[in-house]
Amino acid sequence: MAITAVRRGVRRQSRVRVRVRGLTRPRGRGRRGALLGAALALLAAGAVAGPPARAAEGAPLWFDGRTATEVSADGIRFTDGHGREVVLRGFNVSGETKLEENGGLPFADAADARASATALRSLTGGNAVRFLLSWAHAEPEPGKVDTGYLDRATEQITALLDAGLRVFPDFHQDLFSRHLFHKDSWYTGDGAPRWAVEAGGYPVESCGVCVLWGQNITQNQAVKNATRDFWTNRVLTVGTSGGVRSVPVQDAFLDTAQKTMAHLAGRLTEDRFAGIVGFDPYNEPYAGEYATGQNSRTWERDTLWPFYERFRARMDLAGWRDKPLFAEPNMFWNSNLDLARQEGGLLDAGALGKRYVFNTHFYDQKAISGVFMWGKAKDGQYTGDLGTVRDRAEALDTPAIVSEFGHPLSGYTSDKAPTVDKAMYQALDTRLPGSTWWTQPARSGPVLSAAQWQWDIYSGRHREAMNGNSDKILTAADAWNDEDLSAVALDSSGRAVLRQDARLLDRLYPGAVAGRTLAFSYEDRSRDAGTVLTWNRVPATMPSTARLVGDGRYGVLVWRSEGATRAPTQLHLPSGFTPSSATVVSDLGTVTGPPDYTASGRTADHPIASALEPGTTDARRLLLSAPAAADGAGTLHYALVADGSAAPSAELRASAQRELAAWVAGAGFPVAP
């Protein structure tokens, strides 16, 4: 999961019932607090296959479908086939893959995958997921890929694609492999198959005085040795049905990855395959042990990056040439504990271009520890941390994605979760704290793509025999090393419901922008217990705008047209931003209750309209269409979107429009790249 060394509410009820095995499983609480140990260790060391969205009269929307769904890297941003800037937002699906109960897959079957995807789209408006895969299950015997496992994975990915979600698969590992751990161990891992561990001849796993599971990364000699052997491509002697073979362990992994990717490419239709964004080769890479004279930076340069180049070549051979590799640096490169941070961030990789994406995780190790940060997160808490992610992506000339972030939802630091997660989403949206966003919006920066850890519909209902021990059946929370981070669970009737404030998770965000985003901020008014968290207040110098927003939720987007597409700018509308009451104030006009989108050919009948999200029956999006005559390259556009907590008059909307126009004109936004 995420920075494994340290880490790790409801919108309207989903009407979808999620069919799941074991609905009567007990909700045991189990042991908690497996997160502080990692800190100690560090210090010690448009939709594809689903039916297209339709206009009011029933005709398909012209800009949806494969062209909208297909995503590529374009400089420091993702773009779709229309040339619109794309933001990917969603969840990891899911930590269930790290368990054995569903055979190394996120779901018991495709039906559960469909129900989970529908709930994710309905309850959060997410448009992308990181889909976890297991090397151990893909290659249970050396050189023999389990096509049945890959078929089941393909079926589950298909269900997600058909719900309008984009997918990037991830061969996941934590602590290298569960097969390193004996049946009575306090800890477990996931990743490599049994044969690779048995052939390695590793010492009996022991973390010594470890308090929590993350310490195994730097203190468990078995984990360190196995990880080191993977990166050095140690040749293992393994027994097979055809006799004894010599198997370089990294080569075996690359062979399996290539066959997995080829399997997916061959069994997904072309339209569905368009929804596959790329591939994440290896979760949270770390050397295990550095060679003599080696450090974190030289390890990235001489070991990790050549691995990515080898994986990139396998992607090309498997039919993934046009999809980027999601390259993650040394997992400790952006630790927010100074004594734990290691130099890295692919500093010596040069410009990556469209063949790669800068892929990183971020967790507040200080907050998770319960020792290094007292109190709650505050406005702007992580803008510097995620600003560093933006800076590295710009230096690498590639898009960035934060493919894991989050905070525990139970345990002695869980009271921090509402503020920590709000501050993380804030920093994904903008470089600026709310206190300075209105006065310095030109410094806001690009909106980051991200996937929260995690989305597991079986949360609290597992039945996992830890390390194969039938006397240690785990049911509570994530059923994995005492973690509890799933944003979703099933209620007593089997419906998927959010475990965190829906105002936090169901967010306004720019899914597709016809041009380049210059500034974005969303005030979600999420709650910390009974306290409303308001970090971005409209300034007193804009009284009409402040009055229009009131105490409701609102977001502001400023973008610069590049004159290259007539496809509309698209923002997800959270629950409560209903078509009948949401208010939009923009240079394109003002409206309360945007009408359904209709068009004459490719010309929108209304510059401000709404429509269903592709692949859904209740999630909606706002569509902003600038008339061609007023949308030349370099034209600045803006839109304030409020949730309709009050019904503003046309006069108030017009006054707010004048204030916003003056604010944009005086903010110093560039009109050219």
Model-identified regions with their sequence ranges:
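Extracytoplasmic/secreted cell-surface and envelope-processing proteins
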Residues: 138-142, 176-179, 335-336, 368, ...
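Aromatic-rich peripheral "rim/lid" segments of glycoside hydrolase catalytic domains that contact
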Residues: 346-353, 359, 412-585, 614-672
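Solvent-exposed beta-strand/loop surfaces of large extracellular or lumenal domains
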Residues: 586-617
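Low-complexity, acidic Ser/Thr/Pro-rich repeat tracts that form intrinsically disordered stalk/linker regions
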Residues: 53-59, 673
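Extracellular glycoside hydrolase catalytic/binding regions
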Residues: 69, 240-446
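Signal peptide processing junction and immediate N-terminal pro/mature segment
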Residues: 49-55, 257, 326, 449, ...
